[in-house]
Structure formats: structure tokens, C-alpha cells
Amino acid sequence: GYDYTKASNLVYNGGIQIYTTMDSQAQSVIEKEYKIDSNFPEPIGYRTDSKGNILNSTGGGVMLYAYSNYINKEGYFKLRSSEYKWNEDGSLTIYAGKRLAIYDTTVQGQTDYSVEFKSMYTIEKGKFYSIPGGYLNIPQQYKKRDADNNLVVSADFFKDYPDFFTQDGKKLATKDFSLKQKVIQPQSAMTIVDNKTGAIKAMIGGRKITGRMLYNRATAPRQPGSSIKPIAVYAPALQKSFECEQAGETFPL
């Protein structure tokens, strides 16, 4: 294969020819239509609790937290008094099982603990966006777990970063967090396939998927699974009036 520099040079200066099954007109049409928000329905029919969190359809557990339950209008996340305690040695305990999720991770071969926001949603200008979480920016060396799996932030952290939290009544406020990129919902993807040859004519991987961390359903590798069979196998067979046990053509690999 070619590296990027060599491939780019061949395309623009070397006269290399690239053959593709893609149909430029079809590709242009689906790209245009995917930019029109009115082509996609807004999420409806979901249940919320008294705080605006979206509940699962079964069981009543929270599926998506309301953005406002994490971040206030001034852009602060505030730890509630029931979510933390100050210890006598000056360290801070953040309780597990509350709004912040605490995960064991490994960074450069060392154990770390990721302090993360749970998935949330927001509605902006009538558009529904999901936000797949985020995390507090606390360096690795200041964190450990206690016997109850709570997170303990050492006293040294508050000496080195005295402005990370500010006391706001009984709450601790901070802006030192990162949120993952919001994603418009519902998402969608499309692949147009020539059912005679199997050639891909056009494809698009989602709505508003510009961004390094966003998932592109057209180009991201994933396990095909049985969900692909109705599209790639059964639908073309039915269109050709194949019977249940009828074999199709075989082609050498």
C-alpha cells in the first residue's frame, strides 16, 4: 500500500487513476438530504422523571440525564453535599453510585480511576442532542479508592490545584471537566447497493458527523452480525423471487 504522502503525490501529480463503483450523483443527493433536519423525526414518546431525566422503557431506570442536572447555566458542575465529604487529613471522598461514575482504568501501565459524567441529553433550538458523558480532569497520581470503592482525592491535589473546586454553600463547584461531543438524534446512516452486482453506489455514515470523536457508521469497522442479512442477502433474493431453498450464483474469491 501507499502512505498518505505517496498516495497524495500520485493522485495530484502522478496521473494515477482510481476506479470506483460510487455514483457521484447518488452520493450528492444523500449528502444533501442528510443536511436537512426536517427529513428526520424528533424523538417523541419518552418518559421523564421530575428532574427531566429520560427513563428506560422498562424498569424506570435513568437512560439519559438532563444536561441541567449536571451543568448549570454558568457552566459549573456542582458536587452536592450528599455526594462527597471532606476528611480530617484534607483529602476529599467522592461517593460511588451517585451522579459521577468511577471506573478503573490503566494509563501507561499504572492504575488510574476515571471520574465520569453519565450520558446526558440537551435540547437546543428544538433539536435533541445526546452527550455520551464526560469526566473531571483530576490527574492520576492524586486518586485512589477506599474500602467502599469510593474515590479519594488526596490532600496534595488541593495544595497543587487550590482553585479546582470552589465552595458554594454546601456544594463544591468546578469548571475543570471535559464533555464528549454532543450528537444530534435520531442518528441515521445509508448505503445504496446495486443488488445485481453488490457494488456500493453511495453511502453516508450519519447526521452531522464532522468531528474527530464522532462515530461514522459508514467507515467505522464493526462486526456485521445478523442485522445486515435482511439488507444484503434476503431483500435482493426476495426481489428476484428466489424460493426458500434456492441457491444463488457462486463467485470465486
Regions found by a protein language model. Give the residues of each.
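Extended, non-catalytic substrate-recognition/exosite surfaces adjacent to catalytic cores, especially
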Residues: G1-S227, I231-L253
